[in-house]
């Protein structure tokens, strides 16, 4: 049994990386002593009993301006608790994790939760990715594509990098799920932010609505673009077709109401919403964006991969599925083609092997 630290910016934030970190902490605690080290805390939450939790600072401060101060405090905790391995969750805390472990025997695993092709976070983020690639003992990417990008762009050697996806909680028996081929509803799940490509989604929706006004399209998720998107939907007279549902609780339980899932993102890490859709036997149509869709969707077998950001091609594929019930059923029946590698036991096996050998 090893003592494993999980370093995060804000463990109680509501993002995907934080959700993954919580699940990982609970599961890894079955074979290790887990210490969650949260630099900051946006809100107070009751923590699971499986792991130890510590907050470094009461108020959020700039990592860039306070790097030495923050790293020194983290290092003190690592030494006092004799941590063996430190998982650094996201590039944002790479500088802290690497500096805090310098001069210690703590092994570091940098866990990338975005991808190298996403340049929207700016040069500082790219620099932090470089820090992890250069100085961490092991780099873990979400996809094989990103693994290859790290090897090419940062010259990371094969023995220092692993591709370990996030797992998907499959509480359903696929045999028990009945696909509703009569449904006339499309679903998109994702934060209302620019990276999710809602500008293109609106273009697509306008084309599809002209041909199939008897269908509807629901967008599940909240975010900074809510008001802007609401206004544009009214402007394009799409209120009856396109619906902003906001954040939906127990989202995994409503997929079965829909005919298929659409994703228009510019970038992803590993889109869990697509995996959730497949677990619920939904066909998927997605732009072939970096990274994830091409590793989840078997093109022309359980969905369509569309040339990046080609709204007309996306609309054509959506209309094709709407007009072809047999195709929807065929895609639904093959929804599980790539699911096995995302099952919890498969992913945890990789994590436990990595931690035991490092």
Residue ranges of each PLM-predicted region?
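N-terminal strand-loop element at the rim of the active site
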Residues: 7-65, 151, 163
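A conserved mid-protein helix/loop that constitutes part of the nucleotide-sugar donor-binding site
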Residues: 15-23, 184, 188-210, 224-230, ...
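Nucleotide-sugar donor phosphate/pyrophosphate-binding loop at the beta->alpha transition
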Residues: 65-72, 107, 116-135
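Short His-centered aromatic/hydrophobic patch
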Residues: 88-94, 112
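Conserved acidic donor-binding segment of nucleotide-sugar-dependent glycosyltransferases
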Residues: 298-300, 304-311, 320-326, 340
